[in-house]
Amino acid sequence: MGALVLALVATWVRDDLLHRPGSVGVVSDSELEPTKWKIFGERLVDENPFIRLSIASVGLPEGTEFEQYVIRMRRTATTAVVDDQGRVLLMWRHRFIIDRWVWELPGGYVDQAEDAAAAAAREVEEETGWRPSARPELVLTFQPMIGNGDAPQDLYYVVGAEHVGRPDKNETDRIAWVALDDAEKMIERGEIVGAATVIGILYARARQYDRS
């Protein structure tokens, strides 16, 4: 087992101390107030149905004031689909912003008023041509860039999928079922870089280890 998964398993505690009432590590809001940044206002720069870009006027605790760009994005759902052979469903795609070809888990935006788990399943089918065999299970919701953006990402997990057709031609033309241990090595080699995909693969790998 790779070092990444060993580290993940070692820290994978469902009842984390930070979430236990009265436990060490929990600090009250009143104690944190002196370090809280002040927000004086936020003005819109541009927006579309998926992303809102604005400039916020903020102040540091010691008094310095400045402006910072803020990105607010619609919620996304990403799914780790695994099979009974210990493989995960990945798609090969080009990301023009970083100008790289990378392997990713299927995922995308959750439409307004859409059930997030249903959106996760829809994205899997649209992007890969595989339909999840069950309703995807929500693993966690995380924020990948809280220093300058609000971009909630839901990570889902499901075992089994049925092949129902070809993926959307605008998404990818290369789909692969990759052994989880190989996927972990791809992360270590930098072939998988997306936050949701990295977390999803390591989570699936930890579940695989937990069952063994």
Label the predicted regions.
Residues G2-T11:
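Single-pass alpha-helical transmembrane signal-anchor segments in small membrane proteins across taxa
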Residues A10-W37, T64, W101, Q112, ...:
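Nudix hydrolase/Nudix homology domain
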Residues K36-V45, R135-E137:
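Short secondary-structure junctions
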Residues F40-T78, D84:
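Acidic, metal-coordinating catalytic segment for phosphate/diphosphate chemistry
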Residues L44-P49, F96, T141-Q153, Y209:
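Acidic pyrophosphate-coordinating catalytic loop
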Residues F66, M73-T78, D83, G108-A196:
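Unchanged
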Residues M73-E104:
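A glycine-rich, hydrophobic loop/mini-helix early in the fold
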